[in-house]
Amino acid sequence: MRVLFILFLFYFYTYTEAQQYYPIDPTGKCEQYIGDSVITPCNSIYVSSTANQSTAMLSLNLYFSLLGGSSASCQNAYTFATLCSTYLPECEIFIDNSTNKEIAMPKRVCLDTCNSVSKNCQITSYFDCNQLEPISKLPLFPKESSDYNLTTYGGELNYRLDCYDPPKSNETTVIGYCPFPLVFRNRTIVGKGSDSLDNSENYGYTYVSEDSYCTIPCPAPIFSEKQWDNIFDTSDAISLVSLLCSVYLFITYMVINPKRNKYDYFFSFFVLSIILMSIAGTIGFSVGGTRKLLCPEINRRGVYTDPAVAAAGWIFQFAIINAILWFSINSFELWFQIKFIKRKLHLIKFYILAVLVISIALSVPLSAIGEFNAGLGNFVVWIESGKYQNWFFWGPLGIVLTVGTTFIGLVIWEIYKIVSSTNKSDFFKLQLKPLMNMLLIYLTFVYLFGYNFYIHNSLNGFYGSSEEFKNCIISTDGKDCRIQGPPYSSILMFVFCLRIYGVYCIALYGFSPKTRSIWSNSIVFNNSMANKLKTLYISSGTTKGGTSSTDIKMSTNNNSNMDSGGGKSSSMEPDEIILR
């Protein structure tokens, strides 16, 4: 008997020592819910002496912002009841019969409930359900219950308060909030992908997941707003300047040029392509600028159903295919004229037909299937699908670059052979401008080609930064949070290469002797009104060194006759491929 008694005492002592009780805060109390957050109102909230509902809501709203960007399956009554009960726990009251004092105790959320919600909402990396309370070092989320010792208050030694497990409910509860810079947009979700009732992707809304209510802003937070404005403004400015320059050159070589040769036609058709590319770049002015064209709403990118977007995309694709084809034709013709000096090609009608057919074939189908859309992280309306980009642009561009590279190399080789054998340095100077034009355009096309492959090869790295972006927006105000993307300088260079062609051409041809000759002999400066103004200007002038105004007029007329008579015609200017 003595041995059994000793064993009983040992067991009792061990059990009572091992039993751990949650502490009771004598100043803790039950309060009515103040209702400042976006949760279902509660009748009674437990508040300890070291906290209040307002401070608890700061933490609560942090997780609401996190859940706002989560899937719809996470946004249900079960999830929100669990989250609310974690920071604003339900209050349980025990009355001390000897003093009639109310003892408040929190009803903690069950561990399995916490684990289920954090796993379903994919926030296990942000919230630890196994954490301990700071003072008692007991689980914040008990497995079954919280045990209290209420003997001091006239109660039981092992007062058991079951943990809280809200009723299971799959009813969706949309909180209408997303962490900045994400933008909330309500929608009815039936399933995934094409099962969504509003088919939002076709309207330009991009959600962070298939069943989320948070949309990515437009433009995407790859750069700061100031940097995006700079990109858009740069694109607008260069496009406008390029448009004016190319229109001037087209008028010069195609409209007022009285003696057009086939090289003038080649150059004019290339310039016409640049005009169309520039129009595509300036079409945003019709809707308030490039930003408004690409992003009609703060969370919507422009798509093919927007008339201005569809027009800009089609014109750009048609024009840039035209441009690279005429570039290839020019390089071939330049090589052929140098290689076979006395032989002439008369293929201009064939060239025009071939360029039109190819350009239409590579642009119209894309418009029919709605591929011309604005990108969230781009400054141009273009082909959206990488597959169609490769088929309808990068593939043809690769072929053209190969052809262009071959003929440019052959041109340089032929010039080298001629200069080396004949010592005609003036021949090299003669071909310098067309060669420079080919090289500049070639280099910009090469950059576009290489940049595309850089972007595609870096996509995994860009997408891999989404976790860092998510951590940033839930822990800060989101203003400085960025999704990793291409360097800012590379985007500016891409803008430059796409929009600069008109400036290239006018720098090489806009003020050449041939251009000046075309304008001086054109109807613009040779009509009755212009002649009267010239006569008036000359007759009103004073002479220097005894020369009369009549002498000046006669000298001018003689020079004019020499330019239009037996001298070289405007078609024999140094811009042509002619041996001297």
From Swiss-Prot:
Keywords: Glycoprotein, Membrane, Receptor, Signal, Transmembrane, Transmembrane helix
Membrane topology of this protein: Multi-pass membrane protein
Major localization class: membrane
Any single Gene Ontology cellular-component annotation: membrane
Transmembrane segments: 237-257, 265-285, 309-329, 350-370, 392-412, 435-455, 491-511
Coiled-coil region(s): none
Family per similarity comment: Belongs to the G-protein coupled receptor Fz/Smo family.
Record protein name field: Frizzled and smoothened-like protein K
Organism: Dictyostelium discoideum
Gene behind the chain: fslK
